[in-house]
Amino acid sequence: MSEKTKPVVLNPAKQLMDAGKLSLMFSVRQTRSVDIALAAKAAGYDSIYIDLEHGALTIPEAGQICVTALAVGLSPFVRVPAGATDAAGQVLDLGAMGIIAPHISGPADAKRMVSACKYPPIGTRSNSSSLPQQWIAKMPLVDVQKRLNEETMVLAMIESRDGLENVEAIAAVPGVDVLLVGTSDLSAELGIPGQFGSDIIMKALDRIIAAAKKHGKHVSLGGGIKGGSVNVLKTLCDKGIRQISVGNDVGMLNAAMRQRVIEINKLIA
């Protein structure tokens, strides 16, 4: 492939994880302005994910943020509602470099999402010309699809008892790149909501990490455990966690607002 035809967009988060380094991801739930991608880049994140499962953004709004993320060198991921393969295809065509697929309970769920996200021969993703990932340039279709199959990631969320029980089979699905642990939902399903440092959660994480290593996949950590102790996070990274979802726009704005009020009240007390 010549430099003229080579798609220029890479996936920074994937590059970090493939190199054994840690990827830091920021969640966007409410912010509609593309400035959020600029802010995440300036703060030092390498990736963002736009949340269409729990957030208020539309698909066109998600696409605009994805394009801005591409332009500044962030990996844009989008979490679609459970089983929403059509939405996955749309946001990929609008610039996403990966799909976060929630509530993956078994290999059949994972295969359906992979099929929607990957071009043949891996999947059945429909072709759309002039994609943002290729800077809307005219390039040979075979080159574009090959490169996007390499760079586009499918992050299968393990956040239920069924998902945990079937994690080995999910990890074995070709085209699944990452097992993303939804610790908030998983802890609730296991009867210990919010107890992110418990032995039960740690054992579940050990099982997920082992399944990922066996099948050459990465593990990403979402949910409340990101707010846990430094020692817990250090231990998990040493075990093989390669990505952490570190905060969302609503939570960080709220925390900063509360802190500012505390500071001002101290000054005028």
What does each of the following model-derived ranges do?
Residues 56-72, 78-94, 142, 146, ...:
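N-terminal active-site wall of soluble small-molecule enzyme domains
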Residues 19-24, 45-46, 70-76, 96-97, ...:
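Short, well-ordered coil/turn segments that N-cap beta-strands
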Residues 38, 78, 83-97, 101, ...:
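Catalytic cores of alpha/beta
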Residues 65, 107-123, 250-269:
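C-terminal helical cap(s) of enzyme catalytic domains, especially alpha/beta-barrels
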Residues 1-27, 138-150, 207-210, 214:
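N-terminal amphipathic alpha-helix/helix-capping segment at the start of soluble metabolic enzymes
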Residues 86, 98-174, 185-188:
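Conserved anion-binding
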Residues 36-37, 42-64, 181-199:
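Glycine-rich, proline-tolerant flexible connector loops at the mouths of alpha/beta enzymes
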Residues 17-34, 77-81, 152-165, 218-228:
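Active-site mouth loops of central-metabolism enzymes
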